[in-house]
């Protein structure tokens, strides 16, 4: 069973709130999950300590069992001070390298 550490959306319309969950890779985004390991509230200021709250010990456990974090969650995990496995870091680097640059707002408007 492939396991991912990802965001599950909650909250109201136009007021997002996310749970950081460990879930089966084939499960729906907001569906069943194995364990809740944190929260993310994008409505709070970026310097607020409660914007991202993670259970570091449980995340380390799931990473050791082979769970793969999504790109956004991997950034949160690194900022929290948890060391990601080398395999995950390599995958993130490859995805970042292959990503197309976004056009600026001016260029998009003109096109």
Curated annotation (Swiss-Prot):
InterPro entries: Ribosomal_bS16 (IPR000307), Ribosomal_bS16_CS (IPR020592), Ribosomal_bS16_dom_sf (IPR023803). Disulfide bonds: none annotated. GO terms for biological process: translation. One of its GO terms (cellular component) is small ribosomal subunit. Keywords: Ribonucleoprotein, Ribosomal protein. The keyword Ribosomal protein applies. GO terms for molecular function: structural constituent of ribosome. NCBIfam families: S16. Belongs to the bacterial ribosomal protein bS16 family. PANTHER family: 30S RIBOSOMAL PROTEIN S16, SMALL RIBOSOMAL SUBUNIT PROTEIN BS16M. This is Small ribosomal subunit protein bS16. The lineage of its organism: Bacteria, Pseudomonadati, Pseudomonadota, Alphaproteobacteria, Rickettsiales.
């Amino acid at each position: 069973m492939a396991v991912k550490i990802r965001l599950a959306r909650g909250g109201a319309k136009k007021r997002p709130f996310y749970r950081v969950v460990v879930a089966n890779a084939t499960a729906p985004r907001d569906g069943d999950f194995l364990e809740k390991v944190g929260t993310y509230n994008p409505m709070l200021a970026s310097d607020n300590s409660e914007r991202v709250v993670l259970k570091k010990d449980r995340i380390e456990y799931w990473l050791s069992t082979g769970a793969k974090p999504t790109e956004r969650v991997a950034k949160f995990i690194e900022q929290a001070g948890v060391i990601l496995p080398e395999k995950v870091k390599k995958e993130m680097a490859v995805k970042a390298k292959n990503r197309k640059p976004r056009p600026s707002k001016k260029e998009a408007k003109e096109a």
